[in-house]
Each structure stands twice: as structure tokens, then as C-alpha cells.
């Protein structure tokens, strides 16, 4: 609910009644009452429609900030639960492997008897539920990029509980991801967006979003029917592009269903609205398609490449779809837009460092020793000696070179 109004005594309040409001710019607005429900205990009540003060904007700002904070807490909680779930399930699977039981990768199902695996599954469910609820309170522009924190949390916990080494690139990537997420939270849009299924329906009918949906659908069909059978096994971008394009619809559906659940808690007959079932069907189709092609990408290409590329493509499509559908960027200051984009690209760099160099064994002490060696040679001459000291020369290789040159000389002498 964006703005609350208390009508004067005797003023009718029923569906279909039209209110005439006087705006601050001397214009008039006609508002039709589309739904009547029980009053909720909001702390601010508006009693004067003609007040010259900015009560409307103040209350809307307070409510929007409240929703933003709730969505932020839910999004971070989702990342914590999902990141922890990978560790719990992996820990349970490792315990089964130590016992000599058939592993899941070999077709075994003994993990169903392991309580740690079930704890991980419940943690995953709690994280997905929190993420689902976060879209009902906060903009998708904020919720979706924060999903990168689950990767960060999983990487940190794995180094402590699974004894998996986190190199210097991974640590820098974690720091960049946290900094980028913080910047995005600070500059996130705080508009009220859509607060009811009726408003959601109006947004979906907007010509701009209809054009966007048609273009995305056509591109997705071309990729699925024509490009994927030919180039899917050789080009990593094909499967990831399909997942990302379809993923934009899944997030929009989740956003709409979250609003429907909020209205259902307010005892509104949401189940009578066809849009509820349309969103539910769209979510099922889009998620099924995403899972199918994401599994193909993971099965065909290296995970260290799929994860960061998929994050960039998917988040970019969600932000674009949200900007068109919910107009989350409308009214944002230039500084906030730059800050949001900067935070997003910082997260991208962090995720890239975390995955692309995860097999690179470089420690902080090695970097410091290299820096000290470089500092010893002001003219850069010491570097050549360091290279010579670290180079491995084999006697056999040296002999091969001599033999090669001698054969060359012999051949040249015969020619002469």
C-alpha cells in the first residue's frame, strides 16, 4: 500500500467510487477505488486531503524504507542459508565417502540417511523461501545481485569446514563482492513499485514491457530451436544466454507472486484473479527451462567459467527487465545510478577472481617475496638473475641442443 488516506465522515468508501484529488502543481487527479479491505495498523494516518504539508511523501518514504530494509534482511539471510547449504550437503557426502558407501555420483542414494545432507536441504529451502519473500519487499535490482553473497559465503565456509584452500585471488574476490554489495545497498532504488496484483496487471500491459517480452521470447526461441542444436556444445554463451533471457521472466513472476501472497495475507481473494495463475504458470515454465539449459552448460563447460558468466548475464537481464516493468530506475539521481552500476561491476570482478583463479596456487608470502626481490634491483637487472635462478636446466636438454646443432652443421658440410 503506497499512500493511506482517511476520508472525511459521510464520504462513501466502496468499490467503483471515484475520488478527486488536488495535486501540488495545481492539477487534478481522479482515483477510482478498486478494492476495499480491512485497515492495517500503520503508524502514520492521513487526516487532511488538502494539507499543504508533504505528509504523503514523508509517509511513503518511511514505508518504502521499511520495505527496503525487510527485503534487504531477507536477501542477505537467503544468501547465508543457501551458501551454508552447499557446505552441509558436501560435508554429509564426504562423511559417507569416508565410510566406503556408494557415492551419489556413482548412483548411490545413501545420503538420504545422512542428517547433515537433510540439514543442507532444509537450509537450501529456507534460503529459497527467504529469497522469494525478498522480492515482495525490495526491488529486484537489489535482491538479484545480492545472490552473489551465497557464492562468497560458500567459499569462506568451505575453507574452514571442508579444508578447501582459498587462495589470494579468492580472498580479494570475496572482499570485492562485499564492497560491491554494500555500494549497491547504499544506492538501491527505494520506490514503492507495484503493491497489488491490479497494479501488476497494468504494468504487464504497458507497451514498453510488451515489446520487451516479445523481443526476448523471439530471441529465446531462435536460440533454442536453431542456434543451440548447432553451436550449443561449442559456444558457452548459447546455453547461458537462454538461461538468462528466460530468467528475466522467472524473477518477474516471483515478484508478482510475492505481491499476491502479501494480498492473500490481507485476506484478499487473490485466487479469483487469473493473473495469479498466469504468473504461476510462467514461473514453472521459465524455471524448468532455466534448470534444463543450465545443467547442459555445467555438463559441457568448466564450472569456473559458467558460474561468473551466468551471474553476469542473468543479473543484467533481471535488472533490465525490472527497469522496464517496474520502472525502478525512474526518479533515481545520477549518482545513485552510477553507484548501483559501479557496485554491480565490482561484484562481477569479485566473482570472476573467485572462480577464474581458484586453481592458481599463489600465497601472500610468495607475493611479498617477489615484491622484495623486485625492490632489490632499482634498474630491474635483478629480475634476470631471479629468472635464471628459478629456471630448471636439464643436462639432457642441453645435450639435445648440442646434438641438434651438430647435425645441422654436418648436413651443411655434406651439402657443401
Curated annotation (Swiss-Prot):
Membrane topology category: Multi-pass membrane protein
Residues in compartment: Extracellular: 1-67, 136, 187-207, 255-273, 327-336
Tissue expression pattern: Expressed in the pancreatic islets.
Residues bearing carbohydrate: 25, 35, 50, 55
Induction per the UniProt record: Up-regulated by low magnesium ion levels.
Any single Gene Ontology cellular-component annotation: Golgi apparatus
Protein name: Magnesium transporter NIPA3
Organism: Mus musculus (Mouse)
Lineage summary: Eukaryota, Metazoa, Chordata, Craniata, Vertebrata
